[in-house]
């Protein structure tokens, strides 16, 4: 949590309390279903929340922006971004019902009013969004192929509308 405060110095008290609440909520859910690797739950803030917030270091979404989180799993990167950008609208989608249930419960418990959730693949989502975000949900070429239809043409942010994917590991095969 301290790293979040260090990198994001202008958090409100509400945002701080929302971020602080995530640890207990994810631990509780992780005891019921495997939301985050059991070996990695102690690194929740650095490996999952702060990683999700890396997007905010390249763009500060304009109030009113609409963001689609594809393959959200337990709510990453959507929930941390929704905390940071309370004046933006977030739709979190995932095929797995139990993961959507986790993300919905957590977003409700911390009082997020700017998050909607839907159990579906992005192929089924017809809405238009300023940005599509994703965190290690699928190969880039597949993400681009199935979600580019969801990127709105009308611009309202400093960066052009598009797809922002957080990836890790060896991306050689995806870059080819």
Kindly give the residue locations of the regions a language model identified:
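Class I SAM-dependent transferase core
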Residues: 1-63, 68, 98-115
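Conserved SAM-binding loop of SAM-dependent methyltransferases across substrates and taxa
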Residues: 74-87
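Conserved beta-strand elements of the Class I
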Residues: 68-70, 164
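Short gly/ser-rich anion-binding loops that grip negatively charged ligand groups
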Residues: 42, 71, 89, 93
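Residue-level recognition of conserved structural "scaffold" positions that shape functional pockets
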Residues: 59, 78-80, 175
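S-adenosylmethionine
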Residues: 87-176
């Amino acid at each position: 949590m301290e790293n979040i405060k260090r990198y994001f110095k202008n958090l409100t008290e509400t945002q701080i309390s929302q971020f602080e609440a995530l640890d207990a909520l994810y631990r509780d859910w992780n005891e019921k279903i495997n939301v985050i690797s059991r070996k990695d739950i102690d690194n929740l803030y650095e490996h999952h929340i702060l990683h999700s917030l890396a997007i905010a270091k390249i763009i500060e979404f304009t109030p009113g922006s609409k963001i689609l989180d594809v393959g959200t799993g337990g709510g990453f990167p959507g929930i941390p971004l929704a905390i940071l950008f309370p004046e933006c609208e977030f739709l979190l989608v995932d095929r797995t019902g139990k993961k959507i249930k986790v993300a919905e419960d957590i977003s409700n418990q911390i009082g997020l009013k700017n998050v909607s959730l839907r159990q579906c693949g992005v192929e089924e989502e017809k809405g238009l969004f300023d940005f599509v975000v994703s965190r290690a949900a699928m190969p880039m070429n597949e993400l681009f192929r199935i979600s580019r239809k969801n990127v709105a043409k009308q611009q309202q942010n400093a960066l052009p509308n598009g797809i922002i994917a957080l990836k890790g590991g060896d991306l050689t095969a995806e870059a080819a």
